[in-house]
Structures are given as C-alpha cells and as structure tokens.
Amino acid sequence: MPRSVPSVASRERRKKILKLAKGYFGRRKNVWTVAKNAVERGKVFAYIGRKQKKRHFRGLWIQRINAGTRQHGLSYSQFIGALDKANIKLNRKVLADLAMNDPEAFKAVVEKVKK
C-alpha cells in the first residue's frame, strides 16, 4: 500500500516545475502550462550543453597547445605526432595547462619531443 501523505501529489508536481521556472520572464514563471514547456525546453538545452561543453573545452585546449608550440617553432599537428612517437602520455588538458601556467615545463616537453 502506498504511503499516505497529507498533500496532493499533483500540487507537488506543479510546485516543483514552477520552482524550476523561477527567474523566467513573463508568464513562463507563473503559468503552469507555459512554465512546464519552458522548463522542459530548458532541460533539453542543458543536456545538449553538457555534451557541447566537452567539445568546446577540447577545442580550447588545442588552441592553447598550438599557441604554445608555435612559440617554439612547431605546429600543433607536428607536436602531437612527435609526442606519440616519443611515447609521452600527456593528455591535451594537461598540455594546455602547462602551456598556460608553466611555460618552462612546457618548453622542456617541446625540447624533449624535438630530439
């Protein structure tokens, strides 16, 4: 037998959606049917955004690595190919962080790859 609670389930569902719609403009924030559609659409965009975030960050890391390697006379593709041949297992996130925040260490990696 389901648990008995004093509140009505449908009211709780509506309150949950209206709480998620807080901050929306116009009728989207307080009219149930409009808010429901707006929240549903917002959740779709949030899902898509979580996937796109991974792509965008990878692109950003590649740009940073490319900028760092060009200062040392290599292109990004040459650098990544040479990294693979030298059997250095650093991912793009770490390489981008080195290029931005620790140029000396990044230079050491580039020099190791150039040999």
Swiss-Prot record:
Coiled coil: none annotated. Keywords: Ribonucleoprotein, Ribosomal protein, RNA-binding, rRNA-binding. GO terms for cellular component: ribonucleoprotein complex; ribosome. The keyword Plastid does not apply. HAMAP family: Ribosomal_bL20. Belongs to the bacterial ribosomal protein bL20 family. NCBIfam families: rplT_bact. This is Large ribosomal subunit protein bL20. It comes from Cytophaga hutchinsonii (strain ATCC 33406 / DSM 1761 / CIP 103989 / NBRC 15051 / NCIMB 9469 / D465). The lineage of its organism: Bacteria, Pseudomonadati, Bacteroidota, Cytophagia, Cytophagales.
